[in-house]
């Protein structure tokens, strides 16, 4: 309410609108609606552990490091692909997930590495990143080499790592494109040169691999050993992970989120621009419009 105690404030109007829309949704709710097969094929998990947060935030190594932001980057990439994304703890079951991402999962032990290995052998697609597998549970760096425990997973070694100053830029080549980096670089050498997907192309780092992949059993492991500001390299590598696994993806721009729940597709627009939804002919819009306005919501069934 506003100060007169009668007139609805904007929040009150929004609340009233939501209540009316919920009534409309209840009228067409189908408790037997089946989970879309294309979403099941994209199901993605990101692994989180608060011990990693504390370990990474204490010695950040660079002023450009932010553990939460780094984790969020990979979540945003997955969501932009239209992938249903869950945050899991390391003890959770990974069986139902086609892709599992472990962003900067610094603290590991042999049991966790073996769990990842089993997941991949059974057909899972594991994505590891910089600062993964560097320390044991007590925060001690492994003597077997930088991130030594993950070497069997990635079939490669990491000889060193480095960061640039915030105003300096390095180059990485990947699939005939050149990308900028400056936050973090792992210098990787794969045991199989054909598994090296991206390479540093200038300065001291030139020639070393930045991204490698490895097939184990029915699945794959991809190690992204570089951190960029614009996320373009990580996004393109992640898209290849899904594509090689035969998983179709969307390409939603920043601020556009599309999810399915209880038989309803829901799209929201947190950007400043209109977004034209590409809906199937069978779609029936229940709330909103095909053109998704800023701060808008569209709900449909198909």
Q: What residue spans do the PLM features occupy?
A:
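Anion (oxyanion) recognition and catalysis
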Residues: 1, 79, 120-121
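Hydrophobic targeting/anchoring helices
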Residues: 1-73, 160-165, 169-182, 197-201, ...
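Short hydrophobic alpha-helical runs that function as membrane-insertion/retention elements
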Residues: 6-8, 86-87, 127-128
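Extracellular/periplasmic catalytic domains that process cell-envelope and extracellular macromolecules
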Residues: 37-41, 94, 121, 215-216
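A short, well-structured beta->alpha microelement
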Residues: 74-94
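Loop/turn elements at helix/coil->beta-strand transitions in domains of secreted/extracellular proteins
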Residues: 81-85, 96-98, 122-126, 219
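Active-site and adjacent substrate-binding regions of carbohydrate-active enzymes
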Residues: 92-106
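A conserved amphipathic helix/loop scaffold
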Residues: 104-302
């Amino acid at each position: 309410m506003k100060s007169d105690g009668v007139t609805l404030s904007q929040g009150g109007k929004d609340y009233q609108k939501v209540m009316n829309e919920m009534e409309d949704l209840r009228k067409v709710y189908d408790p037997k609606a089946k989970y879309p097969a294309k979403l099941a094929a994209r199901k993605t998990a990101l692994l989180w552990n608060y011990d990693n947060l504390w370990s990474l935030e204490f010695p950040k190594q660079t002023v450009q490091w932010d553990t939460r932001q780094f984790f969020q980057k990979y979540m945003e990439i997955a969501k932009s692909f239209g992938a249903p994304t869950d945050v899991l703890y390391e003890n959770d079951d990974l069986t139902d997930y086609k892709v599992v991402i472990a962003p900067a999962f610094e603290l590991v032990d042999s049991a966790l590495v073996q769990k990842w290995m089993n997941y991949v052998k059974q057909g899972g697609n594991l994505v590891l990143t910089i600062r993964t597998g560097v320390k044991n549970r007590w925060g001690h760096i492994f003597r077997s080499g930088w991130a030594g425990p993950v070497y069997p997973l990635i079939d490669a070694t990491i000889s060193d790592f480095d960061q640039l100053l915030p105003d300096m830029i390095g180059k990485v080549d990947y699939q005939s494109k050149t990308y900028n980096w400056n936050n973090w670089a792992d210098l990787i050498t794969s045991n199989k040169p054909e598994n090296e997907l991206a390479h540093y192309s200038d300065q001291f780092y030139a020639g070393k691999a930045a991204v490698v992949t490895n097939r184990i059993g029915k699945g794959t492991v991809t190690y992204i050993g570089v951190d960029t500001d614009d996320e373009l390299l990580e996004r393109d590598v992640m898209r290849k992970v899904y594509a090689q696994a035969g998983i179709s993806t969307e390409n939603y721009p920043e601020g556009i989120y599309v999810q399915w729940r209880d038989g309803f597709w829901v799209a929201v627009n947190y950007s400043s621009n209109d977004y034209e939804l590409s809906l199937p002919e069978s779609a029936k819009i229940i709330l909103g419009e095909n053109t998704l306005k800023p701060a808008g919501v569209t709900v449909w069934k198909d």
